[in-house]
């Protein structure tokens, strides 16, 4: 079975796909929003230029681009192996797990470079299988971190060590109806942290937000983006008739003020490989040499069990190989682009103004991307790509079910009610790759319709256009999303 999987991951299907264009005529929807003449670039099959793959399988996210050859291919495979390797708590090679952690490998949460089923729908809290496929971020209500816990509650621990806390999830449901009478349901999850390692934290002084893993689709292209183009999008991202006004999140990464691109709130300027190994798995490295529970009794308990915390768990070269692996992943091509239902759905996507934030076309800078060790990847440069994102942050509202998507968590300039526009490329294969259709930052949306109907704030007008479509038009828009 292992060899079959490897063959499937290496196999690529090449095809010639024609590009076509069609026009959406000017119209006015039921909310009075005027949709101007827009050229709908139907047929954007080559999602990532020369980094596009044509796989339609469970490994569609987990393949190198065609230009990954020679020593790059060797390093890609080494990085892939480290990404999927199950860490243990011993002192040997590929050990170093814990003492507390959230997942035991990158692949435990990002299965096949995608997103493992959220704990919200699997274990309804801290998992019993050594990982929970979620991160629990906490702060005081004044924004400060708790001394005993830092920014993340690690709900898993190695043998003999107590987790920092456990999470219980309860869900509230509410049924709504489209104007044509068709019902839809939204789920609002509520999180409770119990079994605290140290002093219990009063809910009155606690902000808690949960993140499920992101798909690792198009990471290299994101890092190669023309930053000036993104800043220009922010400068002109002002559509008062739609209530849309996106902006950049600037953060300090590696001591330099940079444009944030990665993460739910665009809170990172690189792929944060070392941070993931440290914060998620407790695996120390040259950037994060201290254990994540430094100062807690867990460190002493581990030492008493014969574990050593004096040497790093991961070498710099290993981190660089994982960084290269993530940069070199290819992006699945669009499928069924000539299907009439998909074409109609693409028209509905534009009619609803979805393209104003989920920007169809962007470009990478001439020099491509640069790895942690300074290695240049020029093959990522000068590419026309179709991520369906502006990589800007937008107010997503607080009004739905009394809470909306506001999690009160501030990241750089990004406020609690603001989120980065999620890149949609590859999203139509998530069911095939990961076996579920859970979307949004904590997986509360169980399908495309629920994800759309959770849009508030700057997404409210577009949501209302979708809401007032006919059932046929809504179904067509969903078919278009499945094609991405």
Regions found by a protein language model. Name each.
Residues 6-15:
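Bacterial N-terminal signal peptides that target proteins for export
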Residues 16-23:
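Bacterial N-terminal signal peptides
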Residues 24-48:
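Bacterial Sec-dependent N-terminal signal peptides
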Residues 54-55, 61-75, 85-319:
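Extracytoplasmic redox metalloprotein regions
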Residues 59-97, 321-350, 364, 369, ...:
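Electrostatic cytochrome c docking/interface patches
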Residues 73, 112-115, 156-193, 312-334, ...:
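C-terminal capping alpha-helices of c-type cytochrome domains
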Residues 101-113, 216, 322, 345, ...:
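The canonical Cys-X-X-Cys-His
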Residues 186, 197, 201, 208-209, ...:
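C-terminal accessory segments of proteins
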């Amino acid at each position: 079975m292992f060899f079959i999987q490897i063959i499937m991951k290496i196999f690529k299907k090449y095809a010639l796909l024609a590009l076509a264009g069609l026009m959406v005529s000017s119209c006015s929807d039921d909310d009075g929003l005027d949709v101007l003449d827009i050229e709908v670039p139907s047929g954007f099959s080559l999602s990532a230029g020369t980094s596009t793959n044509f796989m339609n399988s469970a490994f569609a996210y987990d393949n190198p681009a065609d230009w990954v050859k020679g020593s790059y291919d060797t390093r890609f495979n080494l990085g892939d192996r480290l990404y999927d390797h199950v860490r243990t708590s011993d002192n040997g090679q590929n050990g170093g797990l814990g003492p507390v952690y959230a997942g035991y490998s990158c692949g435990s949460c990002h299965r096949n470079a995608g997103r493992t089923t959220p704990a919200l729908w699997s274990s309804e809290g801290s998992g019993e299988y050594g990982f929970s496929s979620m991160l629990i971020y906490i702060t005081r209500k004044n924004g400060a971190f708790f001394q005993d816990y830092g920014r993340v509650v690690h709900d898993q621990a190695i043998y003999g060590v107590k987790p920092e806390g456990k999470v219980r999830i309860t869900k509230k449901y509410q049924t709504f109806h489209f104007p044509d009478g068709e019902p839809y349901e939204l789920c609002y999850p509520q999180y409770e942290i119990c079994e605290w390692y140290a002093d219990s934290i009063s809910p009155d002084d606690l902000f808690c937000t949960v993140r499920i893993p992101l798909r690792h689709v198009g990471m290299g292209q994101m890092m190669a983006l023309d930053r000036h183009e993104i800043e220009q999008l922010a400068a002109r991202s002002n559509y008062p008739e739609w209530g849309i006004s996106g902006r950049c999140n600037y953060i300090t990464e590696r001591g330099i003020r940079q444009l944030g691109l990665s993460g739910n709130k665009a809170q990172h300027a690189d792929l944060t490989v070392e941070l993931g190994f440290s914060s998620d798995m407790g695996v120390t490295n040259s950037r994060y040499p201290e254990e994540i529970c430094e100062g807690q009794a867990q460190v002493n308990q581990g030492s008493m069990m014969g574990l050593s915390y004096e040497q790093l768990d991961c070498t710099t070269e290993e981190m660089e190989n994982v960084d290269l692996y993530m940069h070199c992943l290819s992006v699945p091509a669009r499928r069924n682009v000539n299907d009439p239902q998909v074409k109609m759905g693409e028209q509905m996507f534009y009619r609803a103004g979805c393209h104003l934030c989920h920007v169809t076309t962007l470009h990478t800078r001439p020099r491509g991307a640069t790895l942690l060790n300074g290695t240049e990847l020029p093959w990522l440069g000068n590419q026309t790509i179709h991520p369906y994102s502006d990589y800007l942050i937008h107010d997503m509202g607080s009004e739905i079910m009394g809470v909306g998507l506001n999690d009160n968590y501030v990241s750089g300039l990004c406020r609690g009610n603001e989120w980065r526009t999620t890149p949609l490329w590859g999203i139509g294969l998530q069911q095939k790759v990961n076996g579920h259709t859970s979307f949004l930052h904590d997986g509360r949306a169980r399908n495309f319709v629920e994800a759309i109907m959770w849009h508030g704030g700057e997404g409210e007008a577009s949501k209302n256009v979708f809401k007032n479509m006919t059932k046929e038009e809504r179904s067509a828009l969903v078919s278009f999303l499945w094609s991405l």
